[in-house]
């Protein structure tokens, strides 16, 4: 079969990929990826500065912070509407109410919003309202969720999982890309050695 493809006039070149990742491999996509997040370009020479509160607590809180971070140069607003917590007794976020607050602040400031998707139950509302869907470290290897994200028409911000290797992280991005969404941004938030 391989020989057939090499002599078929419709095939320019056959390349064997040895690495496990196919879609994110520079062998097939040598140019920098530029991802548009509601008018903000991410990648290449474009600097994206995402800032905001750890958790959304009120409209006034988020609006005040949004105005401050925008004045400081941020071009996207992040805030946790849903908060993954170790303790079931800790504040878990305002949920959909928090998402509505982020949307209202976006209307006021023009800043695209970034927030973490915790459950596949919220895929539709996130696809409708969130400019950049964040997948946190705990869900980096939730492969069913990653496949569903691949069917959305929204950029995805994929955080590196706790103790995940770079290969595992890139393979998680491949799950999203293989399902059809190539707008994946990798986010490494801290050095695990400190």
Language model features with spans:
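Non-catalytic terminal accessory/regulatory regions of metabolic enzymes
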Residues: 1-49
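Catalytic cores of alpha/beta
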Residues: 2, 58-66, 121-129, 166-172
């Amino acid at each position: 079969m391989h020989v057939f493809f090499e002599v078929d006039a419709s095939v320019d070149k056959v390349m064997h990929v040895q690495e496990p990742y196919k879609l994110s491999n520079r062998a097939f996509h040598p140019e920098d990826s530029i991802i548009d997040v509601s008018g903000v370009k991410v990648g290449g020479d474009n600097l994206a500065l995402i800032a905001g509160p750890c958790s959304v607590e009120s409209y006034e809180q988020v609006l005040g912070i949004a105005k401050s971070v925008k004045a400081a140069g941020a071009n996207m607003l992040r805030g946790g509407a849903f908060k993954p917590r170790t303790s079931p007794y800790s504040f878990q976020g305002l949920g959909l109410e928090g998402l509505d607050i982020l949307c209202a602040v976006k209307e006021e400031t023009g800043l695209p919003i970034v927030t973490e998707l915790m459950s596949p139950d919220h895929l539709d509302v996130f696809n409708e309202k969130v400019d950049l869907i964040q997948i946190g470290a705990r869900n980096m290897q939730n492969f069913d969720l990653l496949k569903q994200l691949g069917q959305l028409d929204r950029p995805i911000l994929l955080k590196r999982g706790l103790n995940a290797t770079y290969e595992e992280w890139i393979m998680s991005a491949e799950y999203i890309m293989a399902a059809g969404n190539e707008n994946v941004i990798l986010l490494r938030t801290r050095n695990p050695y400190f």
